[in-house]
Amino acid sequence: MKKTLIFAVGMAVGSLVLSGSARAHHGEAGRYIEEVVEITGTVVETQLVNPHSILVLDVATDGKNVRWQAEMGGAQQLIKSGWTNDVKPGTKVTLTGRRLKSGAPYMNLTERARVILADSGKVVMQNANYGQPAPNAQ
């Protein structure tokens, strides 16, 4: 009985601790919520991995290349939503997503976002809520 109670309490405490970590991991405190920006650049690298895939690209800004990173959903999520191998190094893409508050060249593409092949206009990825205002926008 005592071992069962200790185990149950341990599991409950562990669940609370882990749920707080997950909530903090997906928190919006570091990102613009209302402001969605668009950038166009050349893909340097794609990392289709879990839990979040990364797209790295060079964007011409004021006559020089700035290296951007864009965080997306996991590999399986992207593949199920239609992601193809069209996005590879050297491909020119246009990204629409949310930029960090700090102004760092980092974009979140997990909601209200899309990826377009710049040369053909083909939409490679678009979230279901693309084009909608932020949930708390007035």
List the predicted regions and their residue ranges:
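Positively charged n-region of N-terminal signal peptides that target proteins for export
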Residues: 1-4
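Bacterial N-terminal signal peptides
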Residues: 8-17
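Sec/Tat signal peptide C-region and signal peptidase I cleavage site
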Residues: 18-24
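Short, glycine/small-residue-enriched coil/turn segments at secondary-structure junctions
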Residues: 29-49
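Short aromatic-glycine-enriched beta-strand elements
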Residues: 49-59
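Beta-strand/loop nucleic-acid-binding surfaces
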Residues: 67-83
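Short nucleic-acid-contacting surface segments enriched for D/E, G, S/T with interspersed K/R
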Residues: 79-95
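OB-fold/S1-family single-stranded nucleic acid-binding modules
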Residues: 100-128
